[in-house]
Amino acid sequence: MTRQTITILLIFFSFSCNAQQIKIGTWTTRDGGAYTGEIVSGKAHGKGTCKYPNGNTYEGEYVKGKRQGNGTYQFADGERYEGQWFQDQQHGQGTYYFMNNNKYVGLWFRDYQEGHGIMYYYNGDVYDGNWLQDMREGEGKYTFSNGAYYKGSWKSDKKNGKGEFNWGDGSSYVGDWVDNMKHGKGLYKFSDGDSYDGEWKNDLQDGKGV
């Protein structure tokens, strides 16, 4: 018997053993969820559906009793997550549908919106940029439904650092921001062609400027 033949037989035997271990059955999670689907060694492993006492449901992949892989989690209040899971947490690429009709499409880290993602707001606004623990953080662009936009730095869900705000009517501001206010040095161009280049404090012109 050749080495290649032996290798093929070993692979076939391994798959056969794994197939024998997988059963279709029921299982109860630690938090009282009723699972129905593929089971290995007495735990959810593979594809299945779980219904929880609070009305939430999950349909997707499991690894050793935990949500892992791809799956959809439907909340009783109408919110829904579709995407990747790791160790029972929303982790990787996923889409979240909020009860208020907002929709987030992007990266997740341990149940948080983290990394690059796009939030489509119910009123037509869109944010495309970086996130940290469910908040806008780092570089990103927020476009309002009327065409106005802010492009620049964010911290703790607010405009902070260097950024540009364009109102779409010919007026714009490029400069420093602190907690959503023009603060520091910046250039404001008015729609009539005038401009102010100088210091700002709490959203108002302050100190020297031209």
Kindly give the residue locations of the regions a language model identified.
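A structural motif
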Residues: 25-26
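Sec-dependent N-terminal signal peptides
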Residues: 4-15
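Conserved anchor residues at repeat-unit boundaries in beta-strand-based tandem repeats, strongest
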Residues: 34-45, 57-68, 80-91, 103-114, ...
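Extracellular beta-strand solenoid repeats
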Residues: 49, 72, 95, 118, ...
